Every structure is written in structure tokens, then in C-alpha cells.
Amino acid sequence: MSLQLFGHPFSSYTWKVLIALWADETPFKFRMVGPDHPENGDELRRRWPFGQFPLLVDSDQSVVEATCIIEHVQAHHPGPNRWIPDGELGRRVRFLDRVFDLRVMANMQAVMFDALRPAEHRNPADRSIARERLRTAYGWLEANLDQSPWAIGEQFTLADRAVAPSLFYADWVEEIDEGYPQLNAYRARLLAHPLVARAVDEARAYRPLFPLGAPDRD
């Protein structure tokens, strides 16, 4: 049975996995989750009752969480790229992966999910806190990211795949202004990467779904 990936082209965590699969030219069947494909949503919830994606099916095994999926594929279907290096570099990659998911992505999503609520249930205070935390993350990244092309140097790793969708959408929620020149330059390099550009283009048709309104850029 070939690999099956349940997800959506507009989903940041789906991007994270897609970029790795595309880069390694790993064969897989994409099963889009959405109103036009109810059978995929049903199968996703059967395998993972929380209904969250991405989810990878490998024979009779279901693997959830984007980072876990990438580690599973690297272990069982290795390609030419080493997404998590060994040793100290690998620990740095895992640390940055957590920073990008928990400090950038999570706060971006907090603002976005609040916008999806009915107006009477929205919480401006929570949105303000999440935006402030995004600015804190921007400041930390500006000061601590490697000055090389990618997060840990010359090698494009799991950390870069985590930050590409994180910074892409975070900038839509809380713009990364001119006060963060290194971070803006890094975001631009990420968006110029062919596989990140592919993810952006394949998601372009779904921009009307963004609850805050997609800006006229990128």
C-alpha cells in the first residue's frame, strides 16, 4: 500500500510534510480533507478521532503530527535529504522546530481561530496577547537565527520546513515590519525556495478562506 497523506493545501502543518515528500520525491497519494471530499474526513476521524491533519497512513499504521510524520518517513522511506542531522545540529533543529511551532504558529493560530468564532464570542484580550507573543518571537528570531541561508547553516532542514508556513501566515496576522530585517530576509529566502513556492501556489486558490482576509502580497 502506498503512503497516503490526509491534509489540505492551505494548512500550514500539511505544507510542512508536503515539502519533505516533494523534496525526496517520495510517492504518496494526497487525500484532501474538506467539504468536497467527505469520505476523506470520515476516514481521517476513524483513524484519529480528533480530526486534525496532517495524518499519514503507511500500510496499516497511522502517523499523526507533522514532525512525527517527517521522522517516520525519514526512518522508513528515506530519501536523499537528511531532515534532522545527527548530534548537536540535530538537537538545534529539533529545538527550532519547537520554537517555530509553539511560539510562532500557535500564536498565529490563536488570532486566526478567534476570528472564526461568532462575533459575540471573540476575545480581543486574547488576540492582543497572541500578537504580543508573536512580536516577542520575531525579536528572538531576529537576534538568534543563524545568518546563513537557512536556520542552521547551508542545509535546508526540518527547522526550515517548520518556519516556512509559520512565518508565511504569521506575517499575515502580525506583519513582520522593517524592524526585523534579518527575519524579513529569511522569510523572503524561504518563499523563493522552489518547494515552498510550490506550496504557496497550490494554496493560492484557498486564500478567501483566511478569516482575517489575506493581504495582497506573497
What are these regions (language model features)?
Residues 86, 198-206:
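Short, flexible loop/turn segments with low-complexity composition
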Residues 203-218:
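Acidic/histidine-enriched, glycine/proline-rich intrinsically disordered or flexible terminal extensions
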Residues 1-128:
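GST-like domain detector, emphasizing the conserved glutathione-binding G-site
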Residues 74, 166-167, 200:
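Active-site-flanking alpha-helical
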Residues 100-195:
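GST-like fold's C-terminal all-alpha helical module
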Residues 34, 158, 203-204:
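Short, solvent-exposed turn/loop segments enriched in Gly/Ser/Thr/Pro and often Arg
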Residues 64, 88, 178-182, 198:
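Alpha-helix N-cap and coil->helix boundary residues
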Residues 45-46, 94, 146, 184, ...:
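Alpha-helix boundary recognition
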